[in-house]
C-alpha cells in the first residue's frame, strides 16, 4: 500500500512542478513593452484551467504527504 501511495506522491510532485513552471508571470514588467496584448478570452480560460489544475495537485500532494508521514 505504501508503494502505491509513494508512486502517486511522486507523480503528483512532478505534475505540480510542471504546472507551476508553465504558468505565465503575473507582472508584466519592462519585458512587455511593445508586446501584443494577450487578454483574449481563450488565454484567460486557459490560465483559469491551469490555476485549477495547479491547486488540485497541490492539495493532492499535501494530502499524500500527510498520509505517508502518518503511516
From Swiss-Prot:
InterPro entries on file: SecG
Subcellular location: Plastid, Chloroplast thylakoid membrane
Entry keywords, A to Z: Chloroplast, Membrane, Plastid, Protein transport, Thylakoid, Translocation, Transmembrane, Transmembrane helix, Transport
GO molecular function: protein-transporting ATPase activity
Function: Involved in protein export. Participates in an early event of protein translocation across the chloroplast thylakoid membrane (Potential).
NCBIfam families assigned to the protein according to its UniProt record, in alphabetical order: secG (TIGR00810)
Protein name, as recorded: Probable protein-export membrane protein secG
Lineage: Eukaryota, Rhodophyta, Bangiophyceae, Bangiales, Bangiaceae
Amino acid at each position: 500500500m505504501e508503494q502505491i501511495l509513494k508512486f502517486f506522491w511522486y507523480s503528483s510532485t512532478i505534475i505540480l512542478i510542471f504546472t507551476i513552471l508553465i504558468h505565465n508571470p503575473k507582472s508584466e514588467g519592462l519585458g512587455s513593452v511593445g508586446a501584443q496584448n494577450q487578454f483574449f478570452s481563450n488565454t484567460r480560460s486557459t490560465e483559469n484551467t491551469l490555476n485549477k489544475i495547479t491547486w488540485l495537485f497541490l492539495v493532492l500532494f499535501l494530502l499524500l504527504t500527510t498520509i505517508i508521514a502518518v503511516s
